[in-house]
Every structure is written in C-alpha cells, then in structure tokens.
C-alpha cells in the first residue's frame, strides 16, 4: 500500500508529496504531473535491516530540496518501523550528517 505525505512545495505552490510503495521498496515524488519522478530505492538486507541504496532526481529538478524530502521520508520510515538502516546512498549519508537527529542515529547500522 502506498503512503503519501505532503512536504514543502514544488512548482507554483504545488506541494511535494512523497509516496511510499512498500511492494516496490521505493519512495517517490511525482514531478510535472506523472511524466517525471524522483525516487529513493531501498532493499531489505536482513530481517530488520534496510539498505537505503540510491536517490535520483531528474536534472531539471535538482537543487529544489526534493532529495531531502525523500531522505526524510525514508529515515522516518526506518524509525517508525524500528528498523536498522545501512546507508549505501551518498546523499542519505550527507543528509544524516547535516541532520544528526538522535532518532536517526539510533537506527543506523554500525
């Protein structure tokens, strides 16, 4: 089941909505209607461990904070589900370094 939460604004006052597709193991933000999308991919690598693998935002939408919303949604999911996270994605590593919230740090895979 997909879950979405409005976060920030995209274009012309359109809210950024991060959708979580648990079946496909991805978080997405639809851009420009349905034509483009930003995505954060993850995989389960253990019973309670997820690997946040890759974040991708189309070139035309970079620098607008979209990846930040994907990172926050993924880390909030890890915390809410009481999982451990392995951070393969360089952007997620950067996000955690810039936002060292205790609830995120407690859920990182050593």
UniProtKB/Swiss-Prot annotation:
Identification of the protein by name: Protein NATD1
Annotated disulfide bonds: none
Family: Belongs to the NATD1 family.
InterPro entries, sorted: Acyl_CoA_acyltransferase, Gcn5-rel_NAT, GNAT_YJDJ
Entries under Gene3D superfamilies matching the protein: 3.40.630.30
All copies of domain N-acetyltransferase, residue ranges: 19-109
Top-level taxon of the source organism: Eukaryota
Source organism of this protein record: Gallus gallus
């Amino acid at each position: 089941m997909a879950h979405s939460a409005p976060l920030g604004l995209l274009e012309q006052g359109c809210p950024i909505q991060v959708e979580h597709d648990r079946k496909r193991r991805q978080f997405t933000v639809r851009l420009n209607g349905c034509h483009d999308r930003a995505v954060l991919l993850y995989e389960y690598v253990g019973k309670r461990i997820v690997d946040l693998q890759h974040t991708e935002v189309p070139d035309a939408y970079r620098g607008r904070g979209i990846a930040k919303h994907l990172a926050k949604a993924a880390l909030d999911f890890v915390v809410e589900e009481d999982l451990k996270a392995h951070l393969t994605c360089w952007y997620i590593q950067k996000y955690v370094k810039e936002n060292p919230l205790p609830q995120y740090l407690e859920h990182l895979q050593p």
